[in-house]
Amino acid sequence: VLFPSRDGTPLSGWWLPQPQPRGVAVLCHGYVANRCEVLGVAIELHRMGFSCLLFDFRAHGESGGHTTTIGIREVQDALAAVDFVARFGLPILLFGSSMGGAVAIMAAARDERVGAVITDSAYARLRWAADTWWEAGFGRVLGKLCRPVKYLALLLTRTRLSDAEPIREIGKIAPRPILLIHGDRDHLVPVEHAYALYQEAGEPRTLWIASGSGHVQARVDQPENYYGQVSKFIDQWLEARPAHESLHIGPGEITPG
């Protein structure tokens, strides 16, 4: 499928319909990845009864655009994906991996049509994450010396690191539920990001720390536990919805109670 971002950037994706859907899931991939990164998650969500939209963020995969902002303008892409699926009148789940998780938080905070959020290895503040990436790539001393380079990138994209701070927006998601997943051996986005996000999230909120897993690796290392957490979260979310909002008879139809 093809659809425009909120600012007109052309986006490319895959639509995986369910004949009798429980809801619809929008899946957001990570930085320097594409929709294939979350295909495995989409397959599992499809098995759980969800129609799924996987798409490439701007400047990734087959989508248009030449510049990534690592979560800042990508929120416009996620909101456009929500626009795309909202026509079906089904409960909307946002799933995001790494950068996509941060984007999912900010998009859900700004759009009440999103009913629930699941993130995997999301950053709390882009500034914190960027500092970690510099040190991971160049070492602690050289990484700190190279940090000013990021300000050149911000100047070229006319953005600010403070434009991507899910920690400031996550509280707006409540009373809609959120599940935060993070590996305790994540060296790209340390687990402290998850604790910080959880602290600021409203109820209902769930934090699952995947013991021994690195960045977005929990679903590979321990898939049964991972998808068990996801399935339990989804069941609780849908069961808590008013009956008139959760009776479906087709891929885009709802019968009022």
Residue ranges and their predicted role:
Residues 1-20:
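N-terminal cap/lid segment of alpha/beta-hydrolase-fold proteins
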Residues 31-44, 57:
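The serine-hydrolase catalytic nucleophile loop
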Residues 48, 60-91:
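Catalytic nucleophile-loop/oxyanion-hole region of alpha/beta-hydrolase
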Residues 109-163, 168-171:
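Hydrolase active-site cap/lid region
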Residues 173-174, 179-182, 186:
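Short beta-strand/loop motif that positions the catalytic acidic residue
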Residues 187-193:
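Conserved alpha/beta-hydrolase "acid-adjacent" motif
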Residues 198-216:
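Catalytic histidine neighborhood in serine/cysteine hydrolases
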Residues 213-227:
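Catalytic histidine-centered segment of alpha/beta-hydrolase-like enzymes
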